[in-house]
């Protein structure tokens, strides 16, 4: 399981619609595009499916092209070779503090550490750890594996940082 408590700045890319869950409660769904910066400067644009509590009267401000800052929980779902980003918003601000697209927050990861935990040294002599881990999710009768590459900016190893 990969779950992130984050703040996302982005642009509404799909108009809000109202849906009803299996318990009869209504919620709003819309899409947001944001850019994840790359070292080269180009960045990668991602589409995030957003849901939040609300009804028909709450859909008006979510027009395509509107800049938003949202706080909530981001989860990842892998179906075959596709990775989907789903976000449940607790709060949405239509006057974001920054116009820059970004995702900031904390990640909660439950999974298995890969075969290597490497200690490396940066240009200034500081030590850090690099390792990969995967999370498993059941997709029908099969299992889907999502690999994540971690960089820990400290050479300190906790007991759980043991390669498989």
Give the location of each predicted region:
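Single-stranded nucleic acid-binding surfaces, predominantly the OB-fold ssDNA-binding core
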Residues: 1-164
